[in-house]
Amino acid sequence: MQLSQNETNVDAYEVPAIFTSLDLELNQPSGKIIQIGAAVGRLMTGDILETFSCFIKIDEPLDEQIIKLTGITEFDLASGLSLEEGYLQLASIHIKHKAFMNPIVWGGGDSLAIRHELESRDPDFFKEHNFCFGRRWIDIKTIYQMYRFANGLKMQSGLSKSLGRFGLQFKGKKHNALDDAVNTFRLASKLLERLKD
């Protein structure tokens, strides 16, 4: 899937309408990706247009603590996709909706983790396939912390507690990449309302 720059994202100088919220679950201690979750939608309205989730096959045992934390099992991973297949499906959805190039994340680095792991598996992967995301990301955790700081409030907060402080409940299961991506999108939309002049 080789795409031109115009196909991979919207113009960086336009006000973007659609964003991709991205979340990963990782095995430990290796940090290998075991699940990709994404929600694509209109941030100004909070409308989610499409979601995506897949488990990723890995070549190592799944850590017991990660099984307890995420509920992901060896069976889930065995029936999953390769990271390459998972990325290409994610990229297809991101591009189809012409989402802004920088994904929304909780805590930063998820898009970079995908890129680095793909490059470590196949240094030529991005010679055949464009990377669908930009070099940056929109870290909702940091923006939320600055919002709290500006209002003289405690800055430390997890995703679920942060949603609660805006009158929202966490939907789904914590440490599920899709549910975390959807809830990060919901918080980003609510936070955007509060930041408008």
List PLM regions with ranges.
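Short hydrophobic beta-strand that contains or immediately precedes a catalytic carboxylate
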Residues: 20-23
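Short polar catalytic/cofactor-binding loops
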Residues: 25-27
